[in-house]
Amino acid sequence: MKIVDKYTYPRSSRAKLAGLRHYTVDGEEKLLPSVTTILGQTQPKEKQDSLEKWRQKVGLREAQKITRDAAIRGTAMHKYLEDLIRGQRSLDLTPLGVEATRMAEIIVDRGLNDCSEIYGIEATLYYPGLYAGSCDLIAKYKDKVSIIDFKQTNKPKQREWIEDYFLQMAAYGMAHDAVYGLSLIHI
């Protein structure tokens, strides 16, 4: 796996507007809402209700702990993978760090090892004037230019529960196509 300078991804920064994540992107005049913000704001009521039911079932304090631990684990997993791609090694010996490392190694074994070229790490993608986001990796995966986003989970998820992941990747693919003229159908 080698890093190849094939595309020039813009610099960006994140900002909150009315409590929602937006991006400032070089070359864009206005703040662009993040893909995840748009998906969160357009979530079906049933999905919002099921999350609230879960919070009530486990209790607010436990729900906050589970959410916080998942965020810590996800951040540690991403750091491990990004460092690995850049040829560095990171070691987090905290209990959540050890879990994150195990999750990251599964991603390496089941997918990252099949990436031959890396075009972008934590790359900003934006659809001019509409939205922006940051994907974890743009790489040649099994000989196809692909957008890759690392996801961590505590339990296996059913396909219908992760529809937002597919919508997020489709939005990133459309953004890449709009800016670089390359249709990415492998997400």
Residue ranges and their predicted role:
Residues 185-187:
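Conserved small/polar residues in nucleotide/adenosyl-binding loops
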Residues 165-175:
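An active-site-proximal "capping" alpha-helix that borders the catalytic cofactor pocket
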Residues 83-87, 174-179:
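Active-site catalytic microenvironments for nucleophilic, acid-base chemistry
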Residues 78, 133-157, 171-172:
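Conserved catalytic cores of phosphodiester-cleaving nucleases, focusing on short active-site segments
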Residues 158-166:
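Active-site metal-coordination segments of metallo-dependent hydrolases
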Residues 147, 178-183:
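Substrate-binding/catalytic groove segments of enzymes
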Residues 1-132:
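Metal-dependent nuclease catalytic cores that hydrolyze phosphodiester bonds in DNA/RNA
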